[in-house]
Amino acid sequence: MKTCLVVDDSRVIRKVACRIFSDLSYQTVEAENGAEALVACRRQMPDVILLDGHMPQMSGIDFLRSLRSETKGNHPIVLYCTTENDVAHIGEAMAAGADEYILKPYDKVLIEAKLAEVGLVQAR
């Protein structure tokens, strides 16, 4: 079974995202911030990470930079999520290593489409 690490400082948002991924037959792991997410990745690298951009302790972009430097090219797919629809912010996230960019609130159909694009779920 594929795994998804859901990283968001909002417990409610993590639960919604976990439900979406569970419905897509993913096992889910949760982290409240980037620092917790790095620990989770060191323990077991997930297949995909759903990453909030704005969190305390370590932002999503800082997490991406740390993850990419630690994994040296052998890294999971990262879906970067935020409420910002700002081209500069999107560019910074992509440059830091995000594979896809999704605006909140989460949408199951969009997440499934993004996963299908990268071969992590069967397209319907």
Predicted features by range, described:
Residues 55:
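Receiver (REC) domain active-site loop signature in two-component systems and cognate sites
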Residues 44-50:
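Active-site beta3 strand of CheY-like receiver
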